[in-house]
């Protein structure tokens, strides 16, 4: 999984405020930088909702982060978006086209909405603003196939994560879209296009070689 990095300096993609913690001394500064408590604390290489925590006090945050740092984990602290608590949108991008989207909701007191954490899923039609942000996020990450997770904030879409190997079960079950077929079609089209380019390149090289051979042959009779 590729987690969202801090893009504020090199793109216009909206994300929750995020700060990295590399040592214990960074904790208070990171919390202040994202707007204070509550905060989301993440292990940067977690998947399917694992390694994501919600903390409400400095004591809780320090205990958690210190323990994670001791295990060599890379940690980030992220703004908590209250209006999106327990829900998000997964936009599935294939070949820079949005092929399906679903809303995920957490169950009970769980704040993580991941399907693999027993969250519920439902199809959702996202507007042009969400669509543009999802496509741009995949493009910036250089991914032809991506699951872009979006929060619905009062200020519009916020990119939470961009996943390079998104699961298909939840999105296909909720939307009834055959996402696997879209992926297969994209891969086959890309393969055909690559073969076409290679064929053209080979033909051009053969023409150049033939022309050079003719020049050599002509010069030999002068």
How would you name each of these model-derived features?
Residues 168-178:
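Short, flexible active-site recognition loops that position polar ligands and cofactors
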Residues 1-17, 29:
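Conserved N-proximal alpha/beta basic substrate-recognition cap immediately N-terminal to
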